[in-house]
């Protein structure tokens, strides 16, 4: 599975995203041809090689060739994309980004979604940036997007609504739920379009997931900041599936002062948030206190999200994590017919069949028979694949 990791060390904007995808292999002519599926005119595209702090990158610019361009409502943009000649996946990605952007604008201005009126983001260059991002991800075959945290930035920015603090209100709204860094200098580092791309598409935040790199693209922003190169780095890679070695993180903490009833809820929250496995084990701590060790196996991209759950849903005031590797066997999920009815099972590549607990539990409760008897029946009747 191809994945893209957005390393937003200096920030992200729509033009930086398209530029990085061009550097990764999206031809400018393909971008022009695909964008022709939109009923837009009065613009030209250009891309060039640039340098930021000694690092080579690519810039992308949309130049208006007609002065009068209309401002657009969200409903009009959504309809335009839906009725365009764009590919279905490109439409779906672009619609997701625009909807997140519209939801943020609606919340900031206190208006219904259908009444959201775009200014900067309704202009042609922003539409091209968002749809261009969707075209690039589709062209490169990207199936999943992951991202680092985003720099908050500071200062003020001039907008159609006047002088606003950095990040702009819509950007700040879009940043909710995304890890942020606050050690960067003056200036707008994340635009509303850039924040919407990450908020709509990223499946996880933090370090990149385990992958085999295929290429790296550097998309350059217009400004040249003094303290670091104004570049968005996008890593394109192939993520292993099925049997093989997988890089994971192990999160651990020791808890000796929590109501035992809370542990079950904590496990549920972690698993729902994407933890690969959660376990509790007893241990004896200093001063001979009985305690519980919480161990979480996680995808590296989920570190921030799962750490936040542990620290908010338990009495832990800290946790440690370290990298590990695991080997998984290829498997598939099936539904098998038995004398007790249909049962969900996992079938390993060796042919071994293992019953699914939830499915067996449901049968045991419905038929009023012991769970262990359900397991025995399924194992006897399903046996090998």
Curated annotation (Swiss-Prot):
The keyword Transport does not apply. InterPro entries: Ni_insertion. It holds the Pfam family Ni_insertion. The keyword Manganese does not apply. Keywords: Nickel. GO terms for molecular function: lyase activity; nickel cation binding. Gene3D superfamilies: mk0293 like domain, Transcriptional regulatory protein pf0864 domain like. Belongs to the LarC family. HAMAP family: LarC (MF_01074). This is Putative nickel insertion protein. It comes from Geobacter sp. (strain M21).
């Amino acid at each position: 599975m191809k994945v893209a990791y957005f390393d937003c060390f200096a920030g992200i904007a729509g033009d930086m995203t398209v530029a990085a995808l061009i550097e990764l292999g999206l031809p400018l002519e393909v971008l022009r041809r695909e964008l022709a599926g939109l009923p837009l005119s009065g613009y030209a595209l250009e891309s060039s090689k640039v340098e930021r702090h000694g690092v080579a990158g690519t810039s992308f610019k949309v130049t208006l060739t007609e002065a009068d361009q209309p401002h657009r409502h969200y409903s009009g943009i959504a309809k335009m994309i839906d009725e365009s000649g764009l590919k279905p996946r490109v439409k779906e990605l672009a619609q997701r980004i625009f909807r997140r952007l519209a939801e943020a604008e609606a919340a900031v201005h206190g208006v219904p979604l259908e009444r959201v009126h775009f200014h900067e983001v309704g202009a042609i260059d922003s539409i091209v940036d968002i749809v261009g991002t969707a075209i690039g991800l589709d062209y490169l075959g990207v199936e999943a997007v992951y991202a680092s945290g985003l720099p908050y930035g500071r200062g003020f920015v001039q907008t159609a609504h006047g002088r606003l603090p950095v990040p702009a209100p819509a950007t700040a709204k879009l940043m909710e739920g995304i890890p942020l860094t606050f050690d960067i200098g003056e200036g707008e580092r994340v635009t509303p379009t850039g924040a919407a791309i990450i908020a709509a598409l990223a499946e996880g935040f933090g370090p990149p997931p385990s992958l085999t790199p295929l290429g790296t693209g550097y998309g350059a922003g217009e400004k040249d900041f003094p303290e670091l190169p104004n570049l968005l780095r996008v890593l394109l890679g192939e993520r292993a599936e099925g049997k093989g070695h997988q890089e994971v993180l192990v999160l651990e903490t020791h808890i000796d002062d929590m109501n035992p009833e809370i542990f079950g809820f904590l496990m549920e929250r972690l698993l729902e948030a994407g933890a690969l496995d959660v376990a509790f084990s007893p241990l004896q701590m200093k001063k001979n206190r009985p305690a519980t060790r919480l161990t979480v196996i996680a995808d590296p991209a989920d570190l921030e999200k799962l750490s936040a759950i542990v620290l908010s849903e338990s009495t832990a005031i800290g946790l440690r994590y370290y990298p590990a590797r695991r080997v998984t066997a290829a498997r598939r999920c099936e539904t098998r017919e038995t004398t007790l009815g249909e049962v969900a099972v996992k079938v390993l590549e060796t042919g071994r069949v293992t019953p699914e607990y939830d499915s067996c539990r449901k049968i045991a409760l419905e038929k009023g028979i012991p769970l262990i008897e359900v397991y025995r029946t399924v194992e006897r009747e399903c046996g090998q694949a």
